[in-house]
Curated annotation (Swiss-Prot):
Name assigned to this protein: Uncharacterized protein MJ0290
Lineage: Archaea, Methanobacteriati, Methanobacteriota, Methanomada group, Methanococci
Amino acid sequence: MKCISKQGEIKELIKNGKINDVLQLIEEDTLLLEEIYGFLKSDDIQLKITCLAILGNLYLKGKVQITQLIKHLEEVLLENDKDAILNALLILKEIPEVYQEDLLKRIILKYIGKDIKDCEDDKDKSTLPSVKRDKIMIIFEILKAVKNKELKKTKIMYAANLDWKTFRNYIGYLLDNEFIRKTDGVYTLTPKGELLLEKIEEVFRLIYPDK
């Protein structure tokens, strides 16, 4: 009964946004990590995303091993939900050891490779197929458009080939997460945005070495 009540308590805390309380409970009893791992298999995307963030926090506090964190993040990257995938990539980006061990490029390659495989045309496998733009690609194109330039929204929309609704959604996300900044209507990359762009470009250079 104690395990069941703890599971319910943790889930309720997560639903109510009380992440610090969840972290404290797990720090007091690391066996409760199993509950977080279980939630990662849930169909509730927001619950899954929050649990990814909790794992990232626990790793930074030394409560979760890098191999365990990477294992669960990679499992999420192979799913079909783009929001969960994006959050997994952003958590990976915050882990210095990932860059040192060159794991981030391998993981992103696995994700992109899955996307390509899903889009393959069985009639012509001689070249890589076109991949439908997803959230990662749209973010990449916005960051690339802003790089080394001070652009206003219309020029970014044109350079990244975005309609107004899509631009508004993504530019809001990038501003809120401090990948870009806006000053007097002009957008520029932050150091955090430059780092993300650099890592994605490294992956594309590995996939398309002749371009």
